[in-house]
Amino acid sequence: MSNKKLILKLFICSTIFITFVFALHDKRVVAASSVNELENWSKWMQPIPDSIPLARISIPGTHDSGTFKLQNPIKQVWGMTQEYDFRYQMDHGARIFDIRGRLTDDNTIVLHHGPLYLYVTLHEFINEAKQFLKDNPSETIIMSLKKEYEDMKGAEDSFSSTFEKKYFVDPIFLKTEGNIKLGDARGKIVLLKRYSGSNEPGGYNNFYWPDNETFTTTVNQNANVTVQDKYKVSYDEKVKSIKDTMDETMNNSEDLNHLYINFTSLSSGGTAWNSPYYYASYINPEIANYIKQKNPARVGWVIQDYINEKWSPLLYQEVIRANKSLIKE
């Protein structure tokens, strides 16, 4: 009788142990699977919880996102910062787009880089973003919008009024403000306003953006924002500024109310040897290596020139991988 009881106890203990092992294995498989979803660059936001603020997520973006159609070699040296179109950028992980517009005499907005017309309209960008979000509803697109050049003669309204009456009325735009959470932003375009004269709420509002500086300001009443956007400095000073801002971001990784925006771009010196392409070919992999070595929990919003697959390690991929700490096991 005692042998039967012993056998029964051993059977029960074995069953419990095996169940625990399989449960632990399944949990680890699910966790690994969720982390691996970050490697799907079109859907990398999918495993991140809805409750996480966008300010806390490490997000890659592109600087002067609409410059990819420039054909003239001189204009390319001076003004080209991206070689692939919006959909390529989105499919390769970019979720922040630096859109700079000019109001035309037919009261539409076209994209500019300084005085350079980029042969792209704001409608084209919005339509591309809408299609991407339809295909990938787990994602969000953050559109930084700046008035880049003086209005054409004959424009009937202001830049801000035209945008808000003709474009921002589209329901694709998120109309709430505050410290925006990913769950509210999925499937939406979130506006970051770098233009003045806004009369409509929505997105990140009331931006103070001094030129060629690293600065901290407050938006939406309660969110602090630190921006590193030094673009007319030496190569060494630029790299130091990027790393200093990234270090501050890493050290404040749990501050959900502080957004860090870090531009890796340098302006052109007018030749092939100091063009945005040339600088990006060195800066992008250097900063990617820096992230890789630090293995951080957060690097902020990192805005780069020339998102591509040429310079290993790839900056946008290392930025996205920093989000693995947000995925719950």
Swiss-Prot record:
SMART domains membership: PLCXc
Protein name in the entry: 1-phosphatidylinositol phosphodiesterase
E.C. code: 4.6.1.13
Location of this chain's protein in the cell: Secreted
Record-level Gene Ontology MF annotations: phosphatidylinositol diacylglycerol-lyase activity; phosphoric diester hydrolase activity
Active-site residue numbers: H63 (proton acceptor), H113 (proton donor)
The protein's role, per its UniProt record: Cleaves glycosylphosphatidylinositol (GPI) and phosphatidylinositol (PI) anchors but not PI phosphates.
Keyword terms, alphabetized: Lipid degradation, Lipid metabolism, Lyase, Secreted, Signal
GO cellular component: extracellular region
Organism: Bacillus cereus
Entry superkingdom: Bacteria
Catalyzed chemical reaction(s): a 1,2-diacyl-sn-glycero-3-phospho-(1D-myo-inositol) = 1D-myo-inositol 1,2-cyclic phosphate + a 1,2-diacyl-sn-glycerol
Domain PI-PLC X-box: start-end pairs: 53-194
InterPro entries, sorted: PI-PLC_domain, PLC-like_Pdiesterase_TIM-brl, PLipase_C_PInositol-sp_X_dom
Signal peptide start and end residues: 1-31
The keyword Lyase appears for this protein: yes
Gene Ontology biological-process entries: lipid catabolic process
